[in-house]
Amino acid sequence: MDVAQEKPLLSSGQLDVHDLDECRNIRKGSVFIIASGASARDFPLHKYADVPMITMNGAISKFAGTGITPFFYVCTDQGFSQQQPELFTEAMRLCKRVALWERHVWHTTLKPRGELYYLRRAPKLGWRDLLKTDKDLVRCRKLGNGRNRTLGFSRNLKRGFFDARTVAYLALQLAYHVGFTRVFLVGVDLDPLAGRFYEKSGSFVSPCVLDDHFHTRILPSFEILARSVMNEDFRVYNLSNSSRIPVNLVPRVTLEEVDRLI
């Protein structure tokens, strides 16, 4: 795992934006996805410091002061940099790679220390897509309502990603894009009542809409992941005992089991 030493460039100027092809299939093996759920609070980060880690939003706070550099940071909430400016600044300072919306980048004065990649959504499912198989974009094969047309899993982020209304699902697509074959979810509780591990009493709490989308987008997206993406070459495991993701979709493991798998 890399150790953060340099500070970010905080001045304006031309951004060095990298093509997503540059980070496709560049790694293999295990990766941890560190999310913000309360269960991430006790995860022993230093024990697995040599394993690449993808993190998101305020979960970057778990890395502050550790000397551990996240392999990738992703954020799709354009309001996060205004709601939690200190955490967003920390992410831009620490991370080796950052994936953001282009319009998000240009609405902030921060330039990431690491490589910058732009995100974009995968195109909606059309009638012609029903007649062909797309190896990069795994879709819900039902036209139905407009929601079904935007559900899926992207194996190639150059083609766009599918938004499940939880950034952890984007992180899963990123893990596949980069080439990892064993993914361990940390803090993917998806439980608004439990809160985020980094939130403290009396501090500002960013809005949470997980309940609004759990049954309409989040759960159907994980069903696509389990049914059409997970296999011998791409395994996903959940370290959260309080996660709302059903165990029949993503199996749960203990740290002892993780030690045998990585």
Language-model-detected regions and their locations in the chain:
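Metal-ion/cofactor- or nucleotide/acyl-coenzyme-handling active-site neighborhoods
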Residues: 1-262
